[in-house]
């Protein structure tokens, strides 16, 4: 299956949860999508799965307030995490989202890979770097998608990818940086191939009896 990818359009919605205590049992392999509230996270999920309305998109950043779980097949799930970094919401709500996000990232043993999305024109904000540094500490594989790549012509686009790759290189080889566009399909096949590899590797880990370590 090295040259094949999973059929992501077979995905179906499982549940929405305000925190990890309301999620299904912590087993199988989960790959989570995270990003700032205007990074195009929902659009990327919809494009990957070829489902127009799988993840709700909105012109209002910060619409995703819950942890949303989708299943590809038994034991293989996609997770749409609450967006971070949006200032124009009440402080109490922002803190609630941050706690929910942190708990999932730190305690969910079935989390085997993280897709972090950033607008290619405004990458590597402080909150993005915090996510990358945490992932590096946990040795979690990361695919960093520079979204809205269609907004730049090929030359500047490629330069931005190179610049970001250089900036995150010190965090380790487990971070893969790619341009992505839901509109023009740039990077969609690479995303599908990478996620397929993570799912298969995670399933192998479970077969071998290995578990991801819990963080403090």
Swiss-Prot record:
PROSITE patterns: G_ENGB (PS51706). InterPro entries: G_ENGB_dom, GTP-bd, GTP-bd_ribosome_bio_YsxC, P-loop_NTPase. Mg(2+) binds at residues 42, 64. One of its GO terms (cellular component) is cytosol. SUPFAM superfamilies: P-loop containing nucleoside triphosphate hydrolases (SSF52540). Keywords: Cell cycle, Cell division, GTP-binding, Magnesium, Metal-binding, Nucleotide-binding, Septation. GTP binds at residues 35-42, 62-66, 80-83, 147-150, 180-182. Residues 27-201 form the EngB-type G domain. GO terms for molecular function: GTP binding; metal ion binding. One of its GO terms (biological process) is division septum assembly. Its cofactor is Mg(2+). It comes from the Bacteria. Belongs to the TRAFAC class TrmE-Era-EngA-EngB-Septin-like GTPase superfamily. EngB GTPase family. Necessary for normal cell division and for the maintenance of normal septation. NCBIfam families: GTPase_YsxC (TIGR03598). This is Probable GTP-binding protein EngB. It comes from Aeromonas hydrophila subsp. hydrophila (strain ATCC 7966 / DSM 30187 / BCRC 13018 / CCUG 14551 / JCM 1027 / KCTC 2358 / NCIMB 9240 / NCTC 8049). The gene is engB.
């Amino acid at each position: 299956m090295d040259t094949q990818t999973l059929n992501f359009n077979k995905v179906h919605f499982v549940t929405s949860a305000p925190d990890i205590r309301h999620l299904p049992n912590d087993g199988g392999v989960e790959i989570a999508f995270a990003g700032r509230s205007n990074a195009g996270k929902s659009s990327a999920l919809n494009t990957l799965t070829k489902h127009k309305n799988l993840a709700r998109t909105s012109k209002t950043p910060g619409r995703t307030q819950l942890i949303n779980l989708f299943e590809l097949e038994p034991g293989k799930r996609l997770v749409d995490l609450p967006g971070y970094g949006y200032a124009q919401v009440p402080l109490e709500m922002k803190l609630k989202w941050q706690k929910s996000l942190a708990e999932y990232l730190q305690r969910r043993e079935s989390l085997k890979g993280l897709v972090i999305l950033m607008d290619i024109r405004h990458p590597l904000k402080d909150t993005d770097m915090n996510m990358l540094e945490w992932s590096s500490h946990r040795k979690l594989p990361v695919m960093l998608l520079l979204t809205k790549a269609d907004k730049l012509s090929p030359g500047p686009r490629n330069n931005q990818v190179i610049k970001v790759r250089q900036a995150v290189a010190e965090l380790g080889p487990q971070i893969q940086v790619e341009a992505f566009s839901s509109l023009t399909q740039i990077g969609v096949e690479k995303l599908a191939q990478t996620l397929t590899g993570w799912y298969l590797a995670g399933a192998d880990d479970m077969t071998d009896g290995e578990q991801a370590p819990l963080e403090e």
